[in-house]
Amino acid sequence: MKTERVNVNVNNQPYPIYIGENLLQDKSLLQRHVKGRQVMIVSNETIAAFYLDPLKAIYQDFQCDTFILPDGEQYKTLEYWEHILHKLASCNHHRDTTLIALGGGVVGDITGFAAACYQRGVDFIQVPTTLLAQVDASIGGKTAVNHPVGKNLIGAFHQPKAVIIDLNTLNTLPEREFKAGMAEIVKAALIKDEKFFTDLENKMSDLLQRNFIFLQAVIKRAAEIKRDIVNADEKERSGERALLNLGHTFAHAIERLLGYGQWLHGEAVSAGLVLAAQLSHRKNLLDFESLQRICRLLTQISLPIHFPKSINADELLSAMYMDKKVANERLHLILLEDLGHAVVSDQVDDRELKSFLENG
């Protein structure tokens, strides 16, 4: 399989996304984006058991330190972020060090935030090992940790030096996490590319069988969609990048109310996508057939299309206001005018939203 490359260029800071097989064995590739002689690999207990030793071997001629997190969203906290910084300082890492995030979205987010803050900013490389991280979390430079009040409330924009996607890491990904990652691919299609959405409908059976040929193509397309949006609006100033939050205001509220880690992020995103589509239909933006197609595709993937019965409308609405997509005390929701065409809207007031959440 030929390795595919997607080039990102944010504020004249270009970096590549590589997508292929056996990339974790490519010494030249993995050393190419390290400018100094120090690296620290951050991973979690689950991923480290599979991939840490081979990656450490690549850097055997470097000062190579490691920090291993427990596995789970509940550990994406200021406490563990501080532990990473302490390890960097205690091992005497300098400004030319490089952090390597080996893992899923939690590892990538907390490692990137540590890199953004250590000595006012050092390099880091994303090596995402979950489908969700490969198509979304590793791309675009958003780094953060969670706070009891809300998800990703504390963080920074800090672009990686490279994103290295080894498809072989998907062989060890549990089925539930693999399917959760599909939610972000569906989201990318809904935002910008109706043809891509149709392709997903036609190829989903092969994708769920982890066919690498098809997976490489859809990961590349999802990465291109995010690349184009991030290049145009790195820090959500123009509103373009806000489109990537389709379904996420609902999703983040669901995650917080259930307790981080009870639902995977992609599972909450799936329910959020359906809520956004249903609200779009209610406001006469999205036709019923398109809404049905979204629900059918997510159901085929075995992802949730309803938010949990244990959460009531008042709780969900209150939690949504702790999201970052609030401006001038109004929720800015991402809605769909069509498959492949998302828009930012502040035209949903609390009364309408509460009625929608209570009655659908």
Swiss-Prot record:
A Gene Ontology cellular-component term: cytoplasm
Pfam annotation, one family: DHQ_synthase
Cofactor annotation remark: Binds 1 divalent metal cation per subunit. Can use either Co(2+) or Zn(2+).
Binding-site list for Zn(2+): 184, 248, 265
One function term, GO molecular function aspect: 3-dehydroquinate synthase activity
Annotated positions binding NAD(+): 71-76, 105-109, 129-130, 142, 151, 169-172
Obligatory cofactor(s): NAD(+); Co(2+); Zn(2+)
Pathway(s) it belongs to: Metabolic intermediate biosynthesis; chorismate biosynthesis; chorismate from D-erythrose 4-phosphate and phosphoenolpyruvate: step 2/7
Class in the EC hierarchy, top level: lyase
Catalytic activity: 7-phospho-2-dehydro-3-deoxy-D-arabino-heptonate = 3-dehydroquinate + phosphate
Keywords: Amino-acid biosynthesis, Aromatic amino acid biosynthesis, Cobalt, Cytoplasm, Lyase, Metal-binding, NAD, Nucleotide-binding, Zinc
Gene Ontology biological process terms from the UniProt entry: amino acid biosynthetic process; aromatic amino acid family biosynthetic process; chorismate biosynthetic process
Protein EC: 4.2.3.4
Disulfide bonds: none
Signal peptide range in chain numbering: none
Biological role: Catalyzes the conversion of 3-deoxy-D-arabino-heptulosonate 7-phosphate (DAHP) to dehydroquinate (DHQ).
UniProt-listed HAMAP family: DHQ_synthase (MF_00110)
Family per record: Belongs to the sugar phosphate cyclases superfamily. Dehydroquinate synthase family.
Protein name: 3-dehydroquinate synthase
Organism annotation: Coxiella burnetii (strain RSA 493 / Nine Mile phase I)
Biological classification of the source: Bacteria, Pseudomonadati, Pseudomonadota, Gammaproteobacteria, Legionellales
Gene name as annotated: aroB
